[in-house]
């Protein structure tokens, strides 16, 4: 697996912006500065991990190197909490549907399903006993 450290991943162009070495990434991590880690398998981008001061975004890429799942975590008291999950559906490389799941630590759950072709939005809310 190849690891690339950079300032940001440019999703539309499928390329890193401002590549740097592991030491710079480590220094950014320790100082709370944003950076991105790109993981490639067989010359294809498989995962993009965006590190921010209190947030981590893990993007799973499909065979076209397009983001199809994102998990968003929030860091609080040295613990990560999954606060959102995004599922993207595509036809060819055109995004046609987005599902968003939002989570709160008190057990509240929010779901939104967006049909990006018709503009229709379906929403649901629930509370889960935690």
Q: Which residues fall in each region the model found?
A:
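Buried hydrophobic residues that stabilize the cores of well-folded domains
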Residues: 1-130
């Amino acid at each position: 697996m190849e690891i690339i450290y950079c300032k940001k991943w440019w999703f539309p162009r499928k390329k890193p912006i401002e590549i740097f070495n592991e030491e710079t990434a480590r220094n950014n991590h320790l100082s709370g500065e944003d950076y991105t880690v790109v993981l490639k398998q067989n010359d294809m981008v498989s995962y993009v991990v965006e590190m921010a001061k209190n947030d981590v975004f893990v993007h799973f890429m499909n065979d076209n190197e397009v983001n199809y799942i994102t998990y968003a975590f929030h860091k609080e008291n040295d613990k990560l909490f999954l606060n959102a999950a995004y599922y993207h559906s595509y036809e060819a490389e055109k995004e046609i549907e987005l599902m968003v799941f939002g989570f709160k630590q008190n057990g509240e759950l929010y779901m939104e399903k967006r049909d990006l072709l018709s503009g229709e939005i379906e929403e649901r809310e629930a509370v889960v006993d935690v």
